[in-house]
Amino acid sequence: MTNIRKSHPLIKILNHSFIDLPAPSNISAWWNFGSLLGACLGIQILTGLFLAMHYTADTATAFSSVTHICRDVNYGWLIRYMHANGASMFFICLFLHVGRGLYYGSYMYIETWNIGIILLFTIMATAFMGYVLPWGQMSFWGATVITNLLSAIPYIGTTLVEWIWGGFSVDKATLTRFFAFHFILPFIIAALVMVHLLFLHETGSSNPSGINSDADKIPFHPYYTIKDILGLLLLIFLLMSLVLFSPDLLGDPDNYTPANPLSTPPHIKPEWYFLFAYAILRSIPNKLGGVLALILSILILAIFPLLQLSKQRSMMFRPLSQCLFWILTADLLTLTWIGGQPVEHPFIIIGQLASILYFSIILIFLPMFSLLENKLLKW
C-alpha cells in the first residue's frame, strides 16, 4: 500500500511542499524567515478574529470598544497586544526576509520576487488600515494625512480621496470600510503566499553560495522542520516578551487619546515600520514628487533583477557589494530614525541626504561595484 501522504490528492500537495521537498543542504538561519512570516500571518489572523468579535467599527464606539476589550474581555489585553506587537514582529521578519533576498541574489527568481513585492504592498496596506481602527488621535490623523497623499494625483486626485473617505473628511464611512478591508486582506495575503510558494517550488530555494545546489539536496523534513520550529520558538519568545513586559514600547502615546478632528497632534507619524518611507516622502518639498518617491522606495525592489550585473549571484564572495549592502542597511535605519523626528533643522537635511543615498546606492553604486568586482575576478 502506498503511503497516504504520497497518494491522497490534498496531503500529496502538503507532502511535496513541507515534507519530501528537496532543500539545499547549506541554507542558513536567514532562510527561516519565510516560515516565521507564515507563523506571523497565522497569529495575526487568529488574534484579529477574536478582536473582531468584540470590536465595533463605528466612530462613536470604536475607541471605547478597544478599551472594553482590554478591560472586560477575558485575556482581551493579551489578544490586543499580541495583535499590535505581532504586526511589529511581522515587519521585522519581512525586512529581514527581503534583506536576505537582496544579499543572496534571491531576486533572480523573478516570479517569486514579484509576488513578494505585491505581498509587501498588500501587507503594508493592511497594517495601515489596522492602525486606523482603534480610532485614537494618531489613527485619525494618520488616516487623514496618508489618504490625502492621493490628492497629489493630477486631475482625479481630490475626487479619488473623497471617494475613499466616503465623504468630505475621514469619518464613520471611512472607518467602516477600513475595517472591512482590514478583515478581508489577510485572507488575500494568505492566497498570495500560496502563489509565492508555488513559484518558489518551481525552482527550489537558493542558497548562500549562489550556485546550483541540485547535486546536494536533503529532505525538508526532519532537517528544516526542526530548524523552523527553533526559529518559531525564538519568535514567540520575542513577541511574548514584548507583549508581557512593554506592550506599548513601539506604539504612540497619542493613540490613547480618542480621535478629535478639532485638535491636531504636534507630530503626526505612522507606526515605526513605515518611518523609512515616511522620511523619504517628507524629504521632497513637492507633494506629487514626495508621493512618487514614497512608492518608488519600495517599487525599486522590482528592478533589482535588471541591475544584477555581477557574474556571481550571491554577495557571499563580493566584499565591495557587502560593504554597500550594510551601508544601505544603516541608511534605512537612519531614515527610520528621521521619520520619527519633527520637521526642523538638522533633521530635514539628514533626511534628504539619506534619501539621496538610498536611491544612489541601489541605482548607481551597486551596479557599478558589481562591474568592478567582475574586473577583479580576471586579475
Curated annotation (Swiss-Prot):
A ubiquinone binds at H201. It is a multi-pass membrane protein. One of its GO terms (biological process) is mitochondrial electron transport, ubiquinol to cytochrome c. The lineage of its organism: Eukaryota, Metazoa, Chordata, Craniata, Vertebrata. Binds 2 heme b groups non-covalently. Gene3D superfamilies: Cytochrome Bc1 Complex, Chain C. GO terms for molecular function: metal ion binding; ubiquinol-cytochrome-c reductase activity. It comes from Graphiurus murinus (African pygmy dormouse). This is Cytochrome b. Its cofactor is heme b. Component of the ubiquinol-cytochrome c reductase complex (complex III or cytochrome b-c1 complex) that is part of the mitochondrial respiratory chain. The b-c1 complex mediates electron transfer from ubiquinol to cytochrome c. Contributes to the generation of a proton gradient across the mitochondrial membrane that is then used for ATP synthesis. Its main location: mitochondrion. Heme 1 (or BL or b562) is low-potential and absorbs at about 562 nm, and heme 2 (or BH or b566) is high-potential and absorbs at about 566 nm. Belongs to the cytochrome b family. InterPro entries: Cyt_b/b6_C, Cyt_b/b6_C_sf, Cyt_b/b6_N, Cytb/b6-like_sf, Cytochrome_b, Cytochrome_b_C_euk/bac, Cytochrome_b_N_euk/bac, Di-haem_cyt_TM. Heme b b562 binds at H83, H182. GO terms for cellular component: mitochondrial inner membrane; respiratory chain complex III. The cytochrome bc1 complex contains 11 subunits: 3 respiratory subunits (MT-CYB, CYC1 and UQCRFS1), 2 core proteins (UQCRC1 and UQCRC2) and 6 low-molecular weight proteins (UQCRH/QCR6, UQCRB/QCR7, UQCRQ/QCR8, UQCR10/QCR9, UQCR11/QCR10 and a cleavage product of UQCRFS1). This cytochrome bc1 complex then forms a dimer. The chain crosses the membrane at residues 33-53, 77-98, 113-133, 178-198, 226-246, 288-308, 320-340, 347-367. It is found in: Mitochondrion inner membrane. It holds the Pfam family Cytochrome_B. Heme b b566 binds at H97, H196. Keywords: Electron transport, Heme, Iron, Membrane, Metal-binding, Mitochondrion, Mitochondrion inner membrane, Respiratory chain, Transmembrane, Transmembrane helix, Transport, Ubiquinone. PROSITE patterns: CYTB_CTER (PS51003), CYTB_NTER (PS51002).
